Amino acid sequence: MSGKVVQIIGPVLDIEFPSGQLPKLLNAIVVRDGEKSVTCEVQQLLGDNRVRAIAMSSTDGLRRGIQAEDTGAPISVPVGKVTLGRIFNVLGDCVDNLGTVTRQAVQPIHKQAPSFVQLETKPSVFETGIKVVDLLAPYRRGGKIGLFGGAGVGKTVLIMELINNIAKAHGGVSVFAGVGERTREGNDLYEEMKASGVIQSQNLSESKVALCYGQMNEPPGARMRVGLTALTMAEHFRDINKQDVLLFIDNIFRFVQAGSEVSALLGRMPSAVGYQPTLATEMGALQERITSTVDGSITSIQAVYVPADDLTDPAPATTFAHLDATTVLSRGLAAKGIYPAVDPLDSTSTMLQPNIVGEAHYQTASRVKQTLQRYKELQDIIAILGLDELSEEDRLLVARARKIERFLSQPFFVAEVFTGSPGKYVSLEESIKGFKMILDGELDDLPEQAFYLVGNIEEAIQKAQKL
């Protein structure tokens, strides 16, 4: 079915179709003007045989009266092994100058969330091999994790380590959605992934990640839908290949922001703080598809930008309702050189309950947090009066807390290039055992430097003998 463009206002196009031949909502429409072709998505039916569509790329140079073809289906993107190691835009076209991919298997980006009978209801912990995460704020398999942190505290390195570890330990793959962030960051991430071996440029099918970018320079339609493009690729790995998949969304706030721009352009009445009235629905449609089924799981890690550090802003507040865990990166720890700079007291998880993780894990995590909290309270006294003014008991506690703080650091596989020390994957049992030994005072005679940037506790003991 073909119609013609009757109005263009920025990224919004009004298209008129012959009577009785209107396209369905969310269908893709291709508008062609000479060499230029723009794909749009139907958002509203206006009456008078007109639809209002939002463009996925720039509408510069388009004119009224040009032809518009209804494709009869939503935007569809390639899925499967061909996507690994490649960079896609919202329409599933490659943007890495390495040629096109074969569109043997394609899937529409709009789908229903899995039905209740398909879901895996028993909560299970997703082991990452990163001590601080597994012990203090464990991730749920098929859950959603919020990643909070400013610039330069190690967010990218943490993301790459997770991609690396899921491939090694779980045989899973990852999909990365760059939503409305800087193009330079997208390029840096791609180059770092090639350098660290997460993307194998010689043999792309051996890569561990597929990338979907809709960056800041894209129109709001593309930024609003690129998250769904990545999610569709992830769903294929989960449902068809029956794998555990990690889905990274950077940044979930930009998804909401793009939705807000589109909503205003479509003439909807804004709600609180100028956001779209459909905020909760749009967020829910994305988040409900991220889940654990009987076949496999999609575990999602979402970077959350908090506008003006106001946690009550509708965008972050709506996001929090969906999160199972939060990983907060701290500038103070990064300044001390403790990487990963995950704040052990600010990071939380709904999984940290004795009936889910077991009594030993729960007790050890609680004692670690108590020790670090007490150390934090004593820091003012230490700064003013010095360590010598503390009681014997408090001095012992401070010594153990400093060891714990250092033992929470860990050498990463993807950072071997910078640190020169080989990366370590630490199992949950080893993590619990190590922290329990420090808390029980079994290692009080070891120097605190021995615990810095090591894997398990045996390595710390070996390092102490060399010091």
Curated annotation (Swiss-Prot):
> What does the record say about its membrane topology?
Peripheral membrane protein
Localization per Swiss-Prot or TrEMBL: Plastid, Chloroplast thylakoid membrane
Function statement? Produces ATP from ADP in the presence of a proton gradient across the membrane. The catalytic sites are hosted primarily by the beta subunits.
Q: Which InterPro entries match?
A: AAA+_ATPase, ATP-synt_VA_C, ATP_synth_F1_bsu, ATPase_a/bsu_AS, ATPase_alpha/beta_chains, ATPase_F1/V1/A1_a/bsu_N, ATPase_F1/V1/A1_a/bsu_N_sf, ATPase_F1/V1/A1_a/bsu_nucl-bd
Q: Which organism is it from?
A: Cyanidioschyzon merolae (strain NIES-3377 / 10D) (Unicellular red alga)
Tell me the keywords, alphabetical order. ATP synthesis, ATP-binding, CF(1), Chloroplast, Hydrogen ion transport, Ion transport, Membrane, Nucleotide-binding, Plastid, Thylakoid, Translocase, Transport
Subunit structure and binding partners: F-type ATPases have 2 components, CF(1) - the catalytic core - and CF(0) - the membrane proton channel. CF(1) has five subunits: alpha(3), beta(3), gamma(1), delta(1), epsilon(1). CF(0) has four main subunits: a(1), b(1), b'(1) and c(9-12).
| CDD domains per record | ATP-synt_F1_beta_C, ATP-synt_F1_beta_N, F1-ATPase_beta_CD
Binding residue positions for ATP: 149-156
Q: Which PANTHER family match?
A: ATP SYNTHASE, ATP SYNTHASE SUBUNIT BETA, MITOCHONDRIAL
Q: Which SUPFAM superfamilies match?
A: C-terminal domain of alpha and beta subunits of F1 ATP synthase, N-terminal domain of alpha and beta subunits of F1 ATP synthase, P-loop containing nucleoside triphosphate hydrolases
Instruction: Tell me the protein family, please.
Output: Belongs to the ATPase alpha/beta chains family.
Keyword Chloroplast carried by entry: yes
Q: Any idea which GO molecular function terms this record carries?
A: ATP binding; ATP hydrolysis activity; mRNA binding; proton-transporting ATP synthase activity, rotational mechanism
Q: According to its UniProt record, which reaction does this protein catalyse?
A: ATP + H2O + 4 H(+)(in) = ADP + phosphate + 5 H(+)(out)
Q: What is this protein called?
A: ATP synthase subunit beta, chloroplastic
Superkingdom as given in the UniProt entry: Eukaryota
Which BP terms in the Gene Ontology apply to this protein? Answer: defense response to fungus; proton motive force-driven mitochondrial ATP synthesis; response to cold
Q: Does the keyword Protein biosynthesis apply?
A: no
Q: A single GO CC term, please?
A: chloroplast thylakoid membrane
Q: What is this enzyme's EC?
A: 7.1.2.2
